[in-house]
Design a protein with these regions (language model features):
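Conserved non-cysteine loop/helix-boundary elements of the Radical SAM core domain that shape
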Residues: 1-68, 74-93
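Terminal RNA-binding accessory module
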Residues: 84-180
Length: 180
């Protein structure tokens, strides 16, 4: 996990990397494999995190456009270097920052998903009900990532099997497809 987009906060966390170096690594990875999906987690409200640090993280997220992003609010965790710091960011501020990053990521996720419309993916079917089957692409983890929703329409798909699915529409966190 990258955990933050501010070099100052990364230093306080003892992550051993700067925001600039992280940006460079992400760029190199995407240059080598433009189709790669990059996922990470971030922490908002780390002790000492000021508005400028939070804005650096927002800029970091906007610049790197992560395919999948989880955000957590800071809480003391024994055995970490940060446990020795005073937890000085109010919970209301942490929650506001969490919501801001998630709102930003929702827009990014929707943009990324829109780019998938018209493309075909191998989709693993996870489950179904009377109206739809639900699966995921090779880029997605179960339960936490995008689902591909496939209307039943006389299809008899088997859970645990892969199918070629053309994406016909996109939402922020889900795709809708049809079996080819």
């Amino acid at each position: 996990p990258l955990q933050h987009g501010s070099t100052e906060i990364l230093k306080m966390m003892r992550r051993g990397i700067t925001r600039e170096r992280t940006d460079d690594l992400i760029k190199k990875i995407k240059d080598i494999n433009p189709d790669i999906s990059i996922r990470t987690t971030l922490i908002v409200g780390h002790p000492g995190e000021e508005e400028k640090h939070f804005q650096e993280m927002c800029d970091f997220v906007s610049r790197n456009k992560f395919d999948r992003l989880g955000v957590f609010t800071y809480s003391h965790e024994e055995g970490t270097h940060s446990h020795s710091f005073e937890d000085n960011v109010p919970e209301t501020v942490k929650r506001k920052r969490y919501n801001s990053i998630m709102s930003l990521q929702q827009k990014i996720s929707h943009e990324i998903n829109q780019e998938k419309v018209g493309k075909t993916f191998k989709v693993l079917i996870d489950r179904g009900d009377k109206n739809n089957y639900f699966g995921r692409t090779e880029f997605d983890s179960p339960e936490v990532d995008n689902e591909v929703i496939i209307p039943v329409k006389n299809s008899h798909l088997r859970v645990g099997e892969f199918y070629d699915v053309k994406i016909v529409s996109a939402r922020a966190y889900d795709l809708v497809g049809k079996i080819l």
